[in-house]
């Protein structure tokens, strides 16, 4: 329904008639006439969507593995945690004017398809030796003109404390990050410059949040269960093992190439995950119209 609504107003309100799917797993619509902007926001709201924090020096959208929820190598589904973090960060009164934009990525798989090490904060869902679920936390990654791999600041953090810990991470960045030079304002520059001093300050702030503030952002099991219920897999028809399509011999090579590049294992051994490309001849990768 959300995609259909975007396709409809993308056709009626955009002079170019198409949107753009980006590598950060969202959709951009450019060249919206200012006179139509309010109407577009109203249409988005009808399908529970918005454009809040899609730009500016704030916490942007939370990204994750494109195969989240179906990946065969998944330790835990990262989508409920991504949604919980999205709700925490949206309209956060303390983090609406950071030194620079701030991007968080999370993965629950052994293969890092979300490239979390190249984000301001990268989160790996892992299990410790006792089998308890938690996060490995990296901070200060990024690409651009100064590519940096994130620094590990917590080898294991209990899953229910992730918001309290990120509160400390972003708070110290908000306090210490440079605002005098846009090219030196990302958290990767701060972490590289301060090193252990930044890590120690985050840990001290985190302990203050736990002891003095009463750990206000601790995730309860009930809350995790509530959000997880929004990601229940759809009911699918039983897979028939008797139906199989044949491929003409002259197209077998193309099919084998597609099978290798576009098809991945699924956690349900009877299914496969298929990637559909937006790249077409004669147009920019990611551009898509209503058709």
Label every PLM stretch briefly.
Residues 1-291:
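Peripheral terminal and linker regions in Fe-S/redox and tRNA-modifying enzymes
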């Amino acid at each position: 329904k959300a995609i259909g609504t975007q396709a409809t107003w993308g056709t009626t309100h955009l002079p170019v008639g198409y949107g753009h799917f980006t590598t950060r797993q969202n959709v951009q619509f450019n060249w919206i006439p200012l006179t139509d902007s309010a109407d577009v926001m109203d249409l988005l709201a009808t399908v529970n969507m918005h454009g809040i924090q899609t730009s500016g020096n704030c916490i942007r959208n939370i990204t994750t593995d494109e195969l989240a929820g179906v990946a065969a190598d998944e330790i835990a589904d990262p989508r409920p945690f991504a949604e919980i973090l999205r709700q925490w960060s949206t309209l956060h009164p303390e983090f609406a004017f950071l030194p620079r934009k701030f991007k968080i990525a999370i993965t629950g798989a052994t293969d890092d398809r979300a490239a979390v090490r190249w984000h301001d904060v990268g989160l790996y869902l892992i299990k410790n030796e006792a089998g308890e679920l938690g996060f490995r936390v990296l901070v200060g990654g990024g690409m651009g003109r100064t590519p940096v791999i994130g620094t590990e600041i917590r080898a294991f953090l209990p899953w229910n404390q992730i918001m309290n810990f990120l509160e400390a991470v972003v708070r110290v960045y908000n306090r210490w990050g440079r605002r005098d030079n846009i090219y030196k304002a990302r958290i990767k520059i701060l972490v590289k410059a301060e090193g252990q001093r930044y890590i120690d300050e985050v840990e001290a702030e985190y302990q203050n949040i736990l002891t003095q503030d009463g750990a206000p952002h601790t995730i309860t099991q009930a809350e995790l269960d509530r959000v997880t219920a929004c990601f229940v897999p759809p009911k699918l028809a039983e897979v028939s093992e008797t139906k199989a399509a044949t491929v003409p011999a002259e197209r077998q090579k193309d099919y084998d190439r597609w099978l290798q590049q576009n098809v991945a294992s699924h956690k349900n051994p009877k299914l496969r995950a298929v990637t559909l490309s937006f790249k077409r001849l004669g147009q920019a990768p990611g551009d898509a119209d209503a058709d």
